[in-house]
Amino acid sequence: MVTMMREFYAIDQYPFNEDLTRSNFHQFVQNQDLGSAFVMYNEGNEVIGYVILTYIFSFEFGGRIAFLDELFLNEKARGKGYGKLAVDFVKDFAKEQGLKVVMLEIERHNKNALLLYLNKGFKEHYRNLMIYSPQN
């Protein structure tokens, strides 16, 4: 999983600390309240990607919601319908788990992802995404 995460972060030149990522992932999978991680396989049982959902509680949306934190497909798997299958899986999983909404963010340049999510029923939410890091 960490190898795929490194590949995913490299797409947009995000910093990647392998030791920290391993530690965070271990912490994440040990606590089901934080979210869920899924590995994706092709028909030949080869690993082709992963999905990370994180959970929070929202008064605005009336309960527990998911944030689709990461959806990654390796380069060989892109353009073959696996992204559509992954989004369908996330939507079905959210319904089964009683999640109120699934939110996500997309890099501005990633038009393919935007079209995928719009075609799968996601809607643009006209708010600004803001970040504050208390460690800095």
For each feature predicted by the language model, list its residue ranges.
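Conserved GNAT acetyl-CoA-binding A-motif
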Residues: 87, 94-105
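Active-site acidic-Proline motif in GNAT/NAT acetyltransferases
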Residues: 74-76, 80, 108-109
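Generic leucine side-chain signal with a strong bias for well-ordered alpha-helical environments
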Residues: 8, 68-73, 99, 104, ...
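Hydrophobic alpha-helical segments typical of transmembrane helices
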Residues: 24-25, 67, 86, 90, ...
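Conserved active-site tyrosine of GNAT-family acetyltransferases
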Residues: 117, 122
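Conserved beta-strand-loop-alpha-helix junction that forms the acyl-donor binding cleft
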Residues: 100-113, 131-136
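Conserved acetyl-CoA pyrophosphate-binding loop and the N-cap/start of the following alpha-helix
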Residues: 77-89
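Acetyl-CoA-dependent GNAT
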Residues: 3-63, 69, 93, 124-125, ...
